[in-house]
């Protein structure tokens, strides 16, 4: 969410894989994590069940792919929002705003990621993505004079994620929360 590196997404996936992922988003939006079954996904995508397993080892791999694709979208948005911005508070602010905006547009995937945080088979990959974003904020925090930049980066990432959760629940931007994050970064 505080990414300051170029996107790391792979080349565009196949059309069928994209259709399955798109169907997964629609199913997640309608039924949440508990209702996200392989059968519902393939029915929504209009493909045979065996096709699912050509692209994904199992449901867990599919959930991980949904989360990875979401983070690819975040990385692209953050890269665009921070292009040409030197390390510092403004760069982190722009990155956080881009992350929050992508979360609002991708409500189903963000909600799914929140539900999946307690899934032991997904915790490691989700934590690695979180850490990648937090780590990317360290140069900006150091430029701002934070001696404890790594710990601060984790806290800023957590605050930004909490704002995303609150906005997800509200179904809209929460300007006061975003202002509070900006004020924290200006400290």
Provide a role label for each language-model segment.
Residues 65, 79-105, 153-156:
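Hydrophobic alpha-helical connector segments
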Residues 79-81, 112-120:
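Short linear capping/connector segments at secondary-structure termini
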Residues 46-56:
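Short hydrophobic/aromatic patch on the recognition helix
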Residues 19, 28, 56, 63-70, ...:
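Alpha-helical DNA-contacting segments of helix-turn-helix folds
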Residues 1-31, 35-44, 61:
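Basic, helix-initiating cap at the start of DNA-binding domains
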Residues 72-75, 94, 101-105, 119-144, ...:
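Amphipathic alpha-helical packing segments from all-alpha helical-bundle domains
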Residues 1-7, 101, 135-143, 166-187:
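C-terminal peripheral helix-coil segments that are non-catalytic and often amphipathic
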Residues 13-24, 41, 66-78, 137:
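Generic hydrophobic, amphipathic alpha-helix propensity
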